[in-house]
Amino acid sequence: EWYNTLSFCDGFSLSIAKEKQKLPYHLNIIDELHINENANSRILYKLLLYKNIEGKYEILESLIDYIKRNAHSSEFNNIQVKKPCITQEIKRIDLWVRDKDYAIIFENKIYNATDQDAQIARYIDTTIDYNYKPENIFIIYLPPFSSNEPELNSWGKYKKDFEKRYINLSFRNNVLPWLENDVLPLINSND
């Protein structure tokens, strides 16, 4: 009986190996390079900086359109990309998009880093210090999975005030599909 079980396992293992050989080669460069959250933010930053030959921030506009389609609030409809200042790791904010009439704070948690005490609140306060009204500040949280939400203490006094100007865009459910479906078609084959 043991012999039959071992023979079955050997045959099954061989079948799995043959089926794996039929699959296309899979390589995730980001994982292989052991890129951390800062490097991940840098990649997103570079994408958002892209301007087409007409000077439009095509990828940033695409992301804003994606957010407008998927947000639980119409508040995001007030965002109009004009002449954004896009920065990375300024004032400890992972990504920061500031335009004349709005500011967007991106908090990247792709590797499940824990929120610091009052982290989002500090970023909101910093943005207010740059003369943005709270009603014109938006928060985009970027965790690996949509079930990951900011810790309550990260919000400080702002959680309720920002619930309509906050969106959780998980890398798995939102960012990757947006890149595949919305960004990839924008890329010129010469770029």
Predicted features and spans:
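Charged, terminal alpha-helix-loop-beta segments
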Residues: 1-191
